[in-house]
């Protein structure tokens, strides 16, 4: 069985770029092996309210993406051995330019990105793929047919969203095991990552037992950024759940 791929999401720039990277250093010091950083978007429509608020505050504090690139590149030079990922929205890529974004990824050994945007933005993702950068695709809680078809067409790893307030499940499928089984039966063979509302070790175990290949964890940890002791305890709880034999 392949190791469960646990990726920790760090929202950049709130309250400052430096503060976000201090917390990322704490993650690495406590055994984290993969971190996904974002760049603040003016329309982070896929994020939950706390992340939207963080991005808005980060944008107000610093809207110069080159500042983020420089800080992240410095962080990468200090920590060359962890898996570094990125998540960016369409407006971010349009602002910095696809070629500049690709160059940043290549310079920092970033092999995986989540690029959120309209279907017309697919050309940017294909440019990244051609440059050796994998892009994740997204299937929301209601598992729309067009999202499944797109995942089948591209063969990209899937981020499968957990429950979303105000959104109905597809055909009453609410649990990880029935939703992942449904996607596998539809022909999705690529890795499936559980995301959203992953708050504790039990949530990680449920996703693992349902057949998820990995998970993205973010908001539950960022909510503890003012309490390092509780933050470290939760990091270890999540890691243990990701490694425990099942």
Tell what function each PLM region has.
Residues 17-29, 99-100, 143-154, 194, ...:
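Catalytic cores of alpha/beta
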Residues 148-182, 224:
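Glycine/Thr-rich beta-alpha phosphate-binding loop at enzyme active sites
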Residues 97-102, 172-180, 231-234:
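Charged helix-capping and loop-helix junction motifs
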Residues 97-140:
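Hydrophobic, well-structured mid-protein blocks that either form specific transmembrane helices
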Residues 46-57, 219-246:
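C-terminal helical cap(s) of enzyme catalytic domains, especially alpha/beta-barrels
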Residues 6-10, 35-37, 84-88, 113-115, ...:
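Hydrophobic faces of well-ordered beta-strands that scaffold small-molecule active sites
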Residues 1-80, 148, 152-154, 229:
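Conserved N-terminal beta1-alpha1 strand-loop-helix module at the mouth
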Residues 33-44, 108-121, 159-168, 210-231:
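Glycine-rich phosphate-binding active-site loops on the catalytic face of alpha/beta enzymes
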């Amino acid at each position: 069985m392949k190791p469960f791929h646990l990726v920790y999401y760090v929202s950049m720039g709130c309250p400052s770029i430096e503060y976000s990277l201090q917390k990322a250093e704490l993650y690495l010091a406590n055994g984290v092996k993969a971190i996904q950083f974002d760049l603040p978007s003016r329309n982070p429509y896929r994020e939950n309210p706390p992340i939207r608020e963080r991005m808005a505050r980060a944008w107000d504090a610093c809207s110069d993406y080159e500042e983020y690139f420089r800080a992240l590149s410095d962080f990468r030079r200090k920590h060359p051995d962890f898996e570094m990922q990125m998540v960016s929205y369409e407006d971010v890529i349009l602002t910095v330019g696809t070629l500049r974004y690709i160059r940043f990824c290549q310079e920092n050994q970033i092999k995986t990105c989540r690029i959120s945007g309209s279907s017309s933005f697919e050309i940017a993702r294909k440019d990244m793929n051609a440059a050796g950068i994998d892009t994740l695709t997204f299937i929301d809680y209601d598992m729309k047919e067009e999202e499944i078809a797109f995942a089948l067409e591209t063969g990209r790893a899937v981020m499968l969203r957990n429950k979303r307030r105000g959104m109905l499940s597809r055909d009453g499928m609410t649990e990880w095991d029935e939703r992942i089984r449904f996607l596998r039966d539809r022909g999705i063979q690529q890795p499936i990552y559980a995301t959203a509302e992953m708050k504790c070790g039990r949530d990680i175990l449920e996703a693992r037992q349902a057949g998820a290949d990995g998970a993205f964890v973010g908001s539950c940890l960022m909510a503890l950024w003012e309490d390092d002791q509780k933050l470290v305890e939760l990091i270890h709880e999540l890691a243990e759940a990701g490694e425990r034999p099942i």
